[in-house]
Amino acid sequence: MALYYDHQIEAPDAAGSPSFISWHPVHPFLAVAYISTTSTGSVDIYLEQGECVPDTHVERPFRVASLCWHPTRLVLAVGWETGEVTVFNKQDKEQHTMPLTHTADITVLRWSPSGNCLLSGDRLGVLLLWRLDQRGRVQGTPLLKHEYGKHLTHCIFRLPPPGEDLVQLAKAAVSGDEKALDMFNWKKSSSGSLLKMGSHEGLLFFVSLMDGTVHYVDEKGKTTQVVSADSTIQMLFYMEKREALVVVTENLRLSLYTVPPEGKAEEVMKVKLSGKTGRRADIALIEGSLLVMAVGEAALRFWDIERGENYILSPDEKFGFEKGENMNCVCYCKVKGLLAAGTDRGRVAMWRKVPDFLGSPGAEGKDRWALQTPTELQGNITQIQWGSRKNLLAVNSVISVAILSERAMSSHFHQQVAAMQVSPSLLNVCFLSTGVAHSLRTDMHISGVFATKDAVAVWNGRQVAIFELSGAAIRSAGTFLCETPVLAMHEENVYTVESNRVQVRTWQGTVKQLLLFSETEGNPCFLDICGNFLVVGTDLAHFKSFDLSRREAKAHCSCRSLAELVPGVGGIASLRCSSSGSTISILPSKADNSPDSKICFYDVEMDTVTVFDFKTGQIDRRETLSFNEQETNKSHLFVDEGLKNYVPVNHFWDQSEPRLFVCEAVQETPRSQPQSANGQPQDGRAGPAADVLILSFFISEEHGFLLHESFPRPATSHSLLGMEVPYYYFTRKPEEADREDEVEPGCHHIPQMVSRRPLRDFVGLEDCDKATRDAMLHFSFFVTIGDMDEAFKSIKLIKSEAVWENMARMCVKTQRLDVAKVCLGNMGHARGARALREAEQEPELEARVAVLATQLGMLEDAEQLYRKCKRHDLLNKFYQAAGRWQEALQVAEHHDRVHLRSTYHRYAGHLEASADCSRALSYYEKSDTHRFEVPRMLSEDLPSLELYVNKMKDKTLWRWWAQYLESQGEMDAALHYYELARDHFSLVRIHCFQGNVQKAAQIANETGNLAASYHLARQYESQEEVGQAVHFYTRAQAFKNAIRLCKENGLDDQLMNLALLSSPEDMIEAARYYEEKGVQMDRAVMLYHKAGHFSKALELAFATQQFVALQLIAEDLDETSDPALLARCSDFFIEHSQYERAVELLLAARKYQEALQLCLGQNMSITEEMAEKMTVAKDSSDLPEESRRELLEQIADCCMRQGSYHLATKKYTQAGNKLKAMRALLKSGDTEKITFFASVSRQKEIYIMAANYLQSLDWRKEPEIMKNIIGFYTKGRALDLLAGFYDACAQVEIDEYQNYDKAHGALTEAYKCLAKAKAKSPLDQETRLAQLQSRMALVKRFIQARRTYTEDPKESIKQCELLLEEPDLDSTIRIGDVYGFLVEHYVRKEEYQTAYRFLEEMRRRLPLANMSYYVSPQAVDAVHRGLGLPLPRTVPEQVRHNSMEDARELDEEVVEEADDDP
């Protein structure tokens, strides 16, 4: 809660009357313009408490016309009535006069948004733009000049678009971008001079003239008329969000214009505002689009531009306003959300904007503003203005100027005395023990208060005043000067602070004792007294406690540093001590002085500190060790997540119970409550309840920190004041102080500014004696720690039913139903005990507790519990039982739609019982029970019922009314309503009753109504008209009756059709009828077949040789049919050469061998479907496992013969024969499946078969195939085959790529594999190894020869010539490569004769080879030219490629292996 202190400015004696006031936007400096009786004008600057700033007086012999502060610097522009413009630099105490260009009153004076330019305009219409330096001096000539010829009234700047980057514009301008150049240089215009200024300065503005026109000046300095109003413009605003211009004229016409960047305005809205005209209105645009007007009336008028809504705010007389008090001026502080208005009676009215999370859901209009306590000044307030970053309020009342600053309202509670500040110099003192309240007015602005049972102390930082109760009045007991920021009292002592000490004084100020603190400990700045103990906190986060029980204060604990006990904290925000002095609670602040979510508890005796974090609900117990280290023990206190994420702001100890502690916590980030569709909070709590909590705890050395109670702070209370069993005490909001009839539930009102609420355990026991109070405290403590035995011991001697009822109520809070049963028993509350026993079936604990709360009359708790556990069905019933029907309907409509109709129905019954038939009728309709409930309800009022029936046009109601008329014998009228209801059965029934059978038949035929047709058929049967009876029985689908008539009357043709339309039982009866007659046996067979009686149908078909019917029957047979029937039918199809159908029937009969033999015998292809049907499940009892495998292999063999390799593979696999499956898969040639099958089979033979197959493919171009070949040979342990593959790879590298290095590597791998292989013939293995080693040596020699060529060409050539002499060289190395190497060498040496010799030798050894394949054509040409020989012709190459031959050999090997495998 806050108060506004008013400070009158210290104006010079000769200053005169204040005419203008202007706050600096940032700094707390207020400029005030005066006009004296001699028309002399002056300006002075003042500080926030009204002190005049020295050397800031500016005076001229003419009056001030306008004032304007620089946006950031301490530079003030002053416009005078002569046209002079003075710029005063407060920092340098300099005055700079602008060049005298204006010759009339300065009516417009504005700084540009950046502060680099000053815009001035006068009464003659001259508009100038000046550039100024940082000290306020003019730089050159005016940058812009326009002469409009008429009185300038307003000017507003338009901020540039946010997307324009100055750096990017500069780069673009340097690059020659014309648009960028234009933005950096304003060109010459017809009406203005050159302006060298960029649009980033914000130099886009609007100016208005006295004739009602508005002109727009763009970034080029061009002026354009954009608005022409019908009267003088009173106020001009620019809405940045919508890029729109708001114009309000003298006759209160509002116009809204959208203004695009090019400046062409378009009017989008025009309205006439309500209000008194003929005088100047003060208008403000707040919240972006809300217009507030003070027009000299007793109310503020609002117009929401976005929504098009309007409303008014009027001051309330109960706040001290007078009737007929008018509002002159208005101003809004966005930071504080405060709207201030000045009245003609010297009062400042304030409305605070209600935050969304505190306001009522969906609050709009005036409900969003809460009237605050006004500030009373003197005179007629003509101007009011918020300013500076401190959000100070300046008020001009013509005779004086006052500065209002906000300060927190002081309050204190101690020893059953509460003192509450209600105005800057007025206290409300309540003696709670007697209920007597006093008003105490002081001659100072109070900054602090301390109350005891004997006296009240107030101070303002410079003076201390002590007041004591004397009889029925409060009188002064002492006053003394003392600059103490804090103060405390105990008995006859006053404790004040100064640098590094606490002074113990008498009431008259005499110092009796000094409590000293060292410089390292800091200056005392916090004091608190509880019981006989004083605790002191310093600005360096040290604290110390003193025992005051003796004549002099003695140290109770040594001075401790909070930073050492709890590393990471910043400072101390506040501290308190328990009544026994054993525990000190401290609210720390963070390093940046922001509120911390932690609270610290220091145990004086154990020298330990416990830190509780409200944000996480975690308790951290730290034990201080002798060597300055700490041990920590962490645990969690809060189970309810809703209690986390709070920050403590107030904390108190009970003044007599040292274990009881209470604190007030606010939500860390206030948020809007989730709301249901009907606008109500989902958890049922009000806004303040969700964001401010009161939490009480039991704190003991043995059991630690225990949560006792938590509840939302009462909505009528402002803050927690303290606690003393059995009450919590709160300060009341000023607007709630006089509302005696609106006390918060559970709170008891004390006159004036204090309210109290009993502790949860003391509801109903507020006036109990001390013994009962102590017993209750013990009980509450033991219940909190869960020791129920000790809890009951503490109250076993208490016989009061009120105590047990209170215990039961406490069980609702603690949700201890076991204890509640005992309490209900002691209370003799049988109904409650029964309800609690019946509620045990509910799964949610909260729902069961809610039943207990309901029985105890704690309806609000029950409601909250139902909401908490989201049992909206029970909440709905609760509301219904409580008669809160509107809430029940809301819950049903938004959360319990399952019971919506039943809720509507019960509410309608309630309304009916209340004789509200019209509304009851409406809710019966909503519940969809009106068709029988409304006729019942209106049965005594037949005319109304008939009107209702005709109005509703409902078939059910028409039928009900027709039945009523029929019961009254009004047949014609009944027929009319039956016809409206389209009740064809009733129509036919009445027509038959009246003997009009033809009409009844016509209705039945036209409508096809089954009941009508049946009724008419019965009528015809009774009249022995069999044909008509059968016809209408058929239309009624009563086929049994129709069949009966046909059988009785020999209507065999109709019988067949009716039987086919009827049920299987009727078909069988009809078939027996035909069978017994012995004629038309085909019909009997068909009916048996259609009825599903296949055995009888087959028997009859065979007996009567009906083969066509037999085929139709066989088509419907499946595996569920009788195997004997299936076999008999299959034989029939075999006899008639229908083998496929026979196979299907054999398979359905599970005769798999016969079916397979039939396929083989008739050379039938086995399809996949047939193969699947022949496959017996593994766990089937039809065949043994061995027979099942044999059958599968036979199926697979058959598939192999018919070429279905994939199917064969599948069946071999199912039979467990993977080798045969692999052979089948190899025949299919499906490489992907072969690779996959080999990978998953994990059999050596299969790996080898797969690798052999893959070698037959083009593995040279597919690296993946080569990888699989190597992998399969390796997994199959076929190292000899793998060696052969590596050998083939080496040959490919030589033949196709001439890559002898890779060839050597492949031969090496081949050698390794062959060396590891287990050969059948060691001799053959040794021979192969020797061959491989020989080939490897040759290849290595050739590689070495080519590598050494660059270092030693002679040795390299020599090695090549030796290679040519090796026998069988061609089987390893291509001879042509060696010859080519030699030829190339000799060509480079220009030894053409030797080169030619090697060419000729190569031709002899390779007669069919193409020389260009080994020797480049250039080298051959060079040889022939060098020797003068003719050039040779190229011969096509015919070279054997070993790799291709190897591939053919591998292919043959795979085929041989596949054929040889068993």
UniProtKB/Swiss-Prot annotation:
Residues 1434-1462 are annotated as: Disordered. The modification Phosphoserine is found at S360, S1443. Changing P71L: In RP80; uncertain significance. Changing E790K: In RP80; uncertain significance. WD repeats lie at residues 4-48, 51-90, 93-132, 139-188, 221-259, 266-305, 322-361. It is found in: Cytoplasm, Cytoskeleton, Cilium basal body; Cytoplasm, Cytoskeleton, Microtubule organizing center, Centrosome; Cell projection, Cilium. Residues 1438-1447 have a biased composition (Basic and acidic residues). Changing G1276R: In RP80; uncertain significance. Changing G212R: In SRTD9; partial to complete loss of basal body localization and increase of cytoplasmic localization; partial loss of function. Changing T484M: In RP80; uncertain significance; decreased localization to the basal body. Transmembrane segments: none annotated. Residues 1448-1462 have a biased composition (Acidic residues). It is linked to Short-rib thoracic dysplasia 9 with or without polydactyly: A form of short-rib thoracic dysplasia, a group of autosomal recessive ciliopathies that are characterized by a constricted thoracic cage, short ribs, shortened tubular bones, and a 'trident' appearance of the acetabular roof. Polydactyly is variably present. Non-skeletal involvement can include cleft lip/palate as well as anomalies of major organs such as the brain, eye, heart, kidneys, liver, pancreas, intestines, and genitalia. This is Intraflagellar transport protein 140 homolog. The gene is IFT140.
